């Protein structure tokens, strides 16, 4: 039985969620839909959709303050900050200071139980520390990402302004629905534009 699409397939595509990279890692092979004539790998949005549903269920089981979401990429700053505001999660955008998760004597130390990374490549310091302390890792992974140590892969264009807004908007909505904070999607009063980085 096919899972319900959180938004129409065309909406994922219009937002560029399916646009991968011209380099593919073997780890991401299961999430590739096709390769375009120009060599660009296209991601399977049905798998993106399915993984968002799974991530929403998983994250809803954690207390909000136990969820950390990180982003080094500038286009992800606003989506991540808005996601944190809407869900109550903790966010770090920009530089991830070494020791944030591993050194309790630091003033910026964070004690969390799960992490969401926007790009395993860009957010490598956060990844290393999450692995070291053994907390689950959810990662937005593009066609070129390695997925070692990632517990839940969300295959998506993790570089595009609109695609990042859509992914974090959907993930926030799914968490609130699974928590019972909202009982229907109509009650989610935020728009994708609220999550999108400004140019």
Curated annotation (Swiss-Prot):
Mind telling me which InterPro entries this protein's record contains? Ribosomal_uS2 (IPR001865), Ribosomal_uS2_arc (IPR023454), Ribosomal_uS2_euk/arc (IPR005707), Ribosomal_uS2_flav_dom_sf (IPR023591)
**GO cellular component annotations, sorted alphabetically?**
small ribosomal subunit
Q: Which SUPFAM superfamilies match?
A: Ribosomal protein S2
Alphabetic keyword roster: Ribonucleoprotein, Ribosomal protein
The molecular function terms of the Gene Ontology recorded here are: structural constituent of ribosome
A single BP term in Gene Ontology: translation
Q: Does the keyword Ribonucleoprotein apply?
A: yes
Pfam families under this entry? Ribosomal_S2
Q: Does the keyword Amino-acid biosynthesis apply?
A: no
Please report which protein family the annotation says this sequence is part of: Belongs to the universal ribosomal protein uS2 family.
Name assigned to this protein: Small ribosomal subunit protein uS2
């Amino acid at each position: 039985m096919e899972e319900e699409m959180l938004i129409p397939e065309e909406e994922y595509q219009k937002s560029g969620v399916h646009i991968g990279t011209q380099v593919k890692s073997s780890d991401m092979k299961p999430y590739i839909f096709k390769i375009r004539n120009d060599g660009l790998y296209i991601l399977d949005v049905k798998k993106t959709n399915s993984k968002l549903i799974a991530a929403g269920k998983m994250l809803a089981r954690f207390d909000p303050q136990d969820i950390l979401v990180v982003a080094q990429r500038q286009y992800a700053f606003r989506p991540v900050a808005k996601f944190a505001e809407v869900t109550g999660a903790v966010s770090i955008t920009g530089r991830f200071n070494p020791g944030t998760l591993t050194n309790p004597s630091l003033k910026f130390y964070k004690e969390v139980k799960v992490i969401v990374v926007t790009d395993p490549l860009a957010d490598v310091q956060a990844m290393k520390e999450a692995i070291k302390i053994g907390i689950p890792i959810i990662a937005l992974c593009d066609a070129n990402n390695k997925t070692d140590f990632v517990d839940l892969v969300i295959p998506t264009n993790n570089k595009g302004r609109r695609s990042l807004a859509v992914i974090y908007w959907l993930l926030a909505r799914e968490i609130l629905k699974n928590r019972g904070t909202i009982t229907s999607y109509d009650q989610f009063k935020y728009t994708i534009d609220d999550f999108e980085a400004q140019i």
